[in-house]
A protein has these predicted regions:
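Charge-rich, low-complexity N-terminal segments
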Residues: 1-52
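Short beta-strand micro-motifs enriched in acidic
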Residues: 24, 54-58, 101-103
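Long, continuous compositionally biased terminal/linker segments
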Residues: 36-75
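Short, internal acidic amphipathic alpha-helical interface segments
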Residues: 64-106
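Short, highly charged C-terminal tails/helix-capping segments
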Residues: 144-153
Length: 153
């Protein structure tokens, strides 16, 4: 499987939804592999999260896809309140998990997905596109509360 072609096919699908996208080469980044970035809307008010999709070979027949969404780039004065809610949100979160990246005080959602590579790049991109929207729905559900708790009301 061609990882670059896979990310390019996924980018086309995201662009059809009018998401701003960018392919980022893995140069001195903590991510494994190249990254597809997209600004994904999470509500009718126009709020968006920064979504990073990274994919790299996990085995001969599978690809590990990480969907990392920065929901709040820098948590405000409600850091402790937001931190306390993480346990409740993660207990009921159907896919992935919410967390706080302490170094940047960033609130995120992360989902790792093991993808069998027995299809072509276009088929695999369509499958990941579906998973991205599942993750987006999970994020959209708690986004207003996360923003309010963080102190960014």
């Amino acid at each position: 499987m061609d990882n670059k072609l896979f990310l390019t096919e996924l980018e086309k699908l995201l662009q059809k939804m009018d998401y701003e996208t960018a392919l980022v080469k893995n140069e001195e980044q903590p991510q494994l592999g190249d990254t597809l970035r997209a600004m994904v809307p999470v509500d009718d008010a126009g709020n968006r999260v920064l979504l990073d999709v990274m994919a790299f070979p996990y085995s001969e027949h599978s690809l590990l896809v990480q969907i990392y969404s920065t929901m709040i780039a820098e948590i405000g004065p409600g850091y402790e309140a937001l931190k306390e809610m993480l346990l409740d949100w993660n207990l009921t979160c159907p896919i992935g998990a919410f967390g706080i990246y302490r170094q940047g005080r960033q609130f995120y959602h992360k989902y790792n997905y093991l993808l069998p590579t027995d299809g072509d790049e276009k088929e695999l991109a369509a499958e990941v596109f579906y998973v991205i929207h599942l993750a987006r729905d999970v994020i959209a559900e708690i986004f207003p509360d996360a923003v309010r708790l963080s102190g960014h009301d």
